[in-house]
């Protein structure tokens, strides 16, 4: 009887073994494929014009990188830092407004746009990115300037402001990554070894643009031409690598614990309907930075300066104007 029972159970055990073997094989194949994508395969770059439509592109070489930037206008200097995956084209509405009475330097930091890092081992962490901003300002002869930063590079601006307060006149933070709290799910995925590398290589223009739309409430402002202009430099191998490196190496505790040491007059701008970095952080950030001002832009998303350029430009020009008593109505 026991022998008959054993014979009946053998097919079941064989099925379990075959199933487990198949699952292990499929898992091994998936890991191998992901590893090849992450560390071997290199997607093609999309070719396109490198010239900024704002003004003539300029380049300056430093020990860190060959920085791509534009210089527009005349007056007290302002440095503009684009957010992650964007480049200085994002400030196409801001630059003309500020250039009326400022010298505006819009610069692609390492990982942005058409700046090229010289060192393949550049870490893209906060100390490295802060040092890169310092190198750029030194290279173009700026001992001191106001700094405007968006999103991911808001953390860089804050790091620079507390480390070198004598070099920051005024500080504007637009939906910055600044508080040591949970990142959004996509950014958390990029922090996982091999997954982040594979994700950034598998991103296509269509996938990128689909995700980028989440940064806008007024999505008609993200025209096909603008979306393509953002994608072209992002498809560069160095910028794909920077995507996961900057997120994975980002230690927001370095920024969070020094917020009370920011001495520059600071303006915090945030889109009311930001789904990338939640707008509740605006009030918290404002309470942590001494003497800062906070304005939440109604009906705007994460790319607040593109979603509502009229409102943002008004606040920027009022805050940065050479006559500090100027106010907007």
Feature roles, as predicted:
Residues 162, 170-199:
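Flexible "cap/lid" loop of the alpha/beta hydrolase fold
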Residues 63, 70-72, 109-148, 152, ...:
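Active-site loop/oxyanion-hole signature of alpha/beta-hydrolase fold enzymes
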Residues 273-277:
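Acidic catalytic loop of the alpha/beta-hydrolase fold
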Residues 292-329:
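Catalytic active-site module of serine/aspartate enzymes centered on a nucleophile-bearing elbow/loop
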Residues 48, 183-188, 202-261:
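Conserved alpha/beta-hydrolase catalytic His-Asp/Glu region
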Residues 1-76, 101-102, 142-143, 321-329:
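Alpha/beta-hydrolase fold catalytic core
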Residues 72-114:
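Conserved HGGG/HGGXW glycine-rich cap/lid loop of the alpha/beta-hydrolase fold
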Residues 262, 268-270:
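Short beta-strand/loop motif that positions the catalytic acidic residue
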């Amino acid at each position: 009887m026991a022998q008959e029972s054993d014979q009946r159970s053998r097919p079941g055990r064989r099925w379990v073994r075959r199933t487990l073997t198949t699952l292990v094989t499929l898992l091994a194949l998936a890991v191998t494929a992901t590893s090849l994508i992450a560390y071997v395969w290199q997607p093609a770059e999309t070719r396109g014009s490198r010239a900024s439509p704002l003004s003539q592109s300029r380049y300056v070489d430093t020990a860190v990188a060959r920085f791509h930037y534009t210089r527009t206008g005349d007056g007290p200097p302002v440095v503009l830092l684009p957010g992650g995956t964007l480049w200085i084209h994002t400030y196409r509405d801001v630059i003309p407004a500020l250039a009326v009475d400022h010298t505006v330097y819009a610069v692609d930091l390492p990982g942005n746009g058409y700046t090229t890092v010289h060192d393949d081992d550049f870490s893209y962490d906060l100390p490295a990115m802060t040092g890169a901003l310092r190198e750029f300002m030194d290279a173009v002869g700026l001992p001191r300037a106001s700094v405007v930063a968006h999103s991911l590079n808001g953390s860089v601006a804050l790091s620079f402001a507390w480390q070198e307060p004598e070099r920051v006149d005024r500080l504007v933070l637009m939906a910055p990554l600044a508080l040591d709290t949970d990142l959004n799910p996509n950014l958390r995925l990029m922090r996982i070894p091999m997954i982040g590398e594979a994700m950034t290589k598998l991103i296509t223009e269509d996938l990128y643009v689909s995700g980028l739309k989440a940064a806008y409430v007024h999505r008609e402002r993200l025209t096909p031409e603008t979306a393509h202009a953002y994608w072209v430099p992002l498809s560069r191998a160095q910028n794909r690598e920077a995507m996961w490196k900057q997120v994975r190496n980002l230690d927001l505790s370095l920024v969070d614990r020094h917020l009370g040491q920011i001495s520059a007059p600071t303006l915090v701008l945030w889109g009311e309907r930001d789904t990338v970095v939640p707008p509740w952080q605006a009030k918290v950030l404002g309470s942590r930075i001494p003497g800062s001002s906070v304005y939440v832009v109604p009906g705007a998303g994460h790319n607040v300066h593109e979603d509502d350029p009229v409102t943002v430009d008004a606040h920027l020009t009022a805050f940065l104007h050479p006559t500090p008593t100027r106010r907007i109505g």
